[in-house]
Regions:
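Small-residue helix/turn framework positions
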Residues: 4-191
Length: 191
């Protein structure tokens, strides 16, 4: 619908087998310059399958994904670009595993962990038999500034331990710069 400063995007909704995207926003026209703002949510019951459908290999298996976003870029909605992308994305992956991770030594921690014992009582043995790194959740947020996505709070809560990540992804230059720390879950294994 029309607004005093451009067009209001009342509702955008995209749905496929593995994902649901919905949002709303504005398309502004100020002094002959277009800009777009889009707020909404994206969810997927199987995020790995969603990415595979886009021909993007991720190594994520059996994990639900939920996110909220508030994004803006200079230009029209159909002229999306990383160079002027700004905003915030809060996201969460739950209960899955990463298949592309070497798990040498991590299985012993997952066998002894109290959190893992609860999963065994629920007859969930994926963290023992599946090759990769099992996690309870991965949560974080990205602040985007002209196509550079910064995070200070990404946390991977895994059966073998906890991983924290801080740093950035430069979407324009396709570069990564992260500090990653791993803390094994030794205390949850002690009597």
């Amino acid at each position: 619908s029309r607004s005093a400063t451009g067009m209001k995007i009342d509702q955008v909704r995209l749905n496929n087998t593995h994902g649901l995207f919905y949002g709303s926003g504005n398309w502004f026209l100020t002094n002959g310059q277009s800009s777009t703002r889009l707020k909404g949510e994206f969810s997927s019951a199987d995020f790995g399958a969603f990415l595979k459908g886009l021909k993007l290999g991720s190594g994520i298996k059996d994990s639900e994904f939920n996110s909220k976003f508030d994004l803006s870029w200079k230009r029209a909605p159909h002229e999306f670009n990383f160079e002027t992308l700004n905003g915030q994305i809060d996201w969460r992956l739950s209960d899955g595993y990463l298949t592309e991770v070497s798990d040498q030594g991590s299985r012993i921690f997952s066998l002894l962990s109290l959190d893992s014992l609860v999963r065994k009582l629920q007859l969930d043995f994926r963290d023992v038999f599946v090759k990769g790194f099992f996690y309870e959740k991965i949560i974080g947020s990205f602040q985007l500034d002209n196509g550079v996505a910064y995070t200070q709070d990404t946390l991977v809560d895994g059966g073998a331990g906890e991983i924290t990540m801080q740093g950035y992804t430069d979407l324009n230059a396709q570069q990564l710069n992260y500090q990653i720390a791993f803390t094994p879950n030794v205390t949850s294994s002690l009597p």
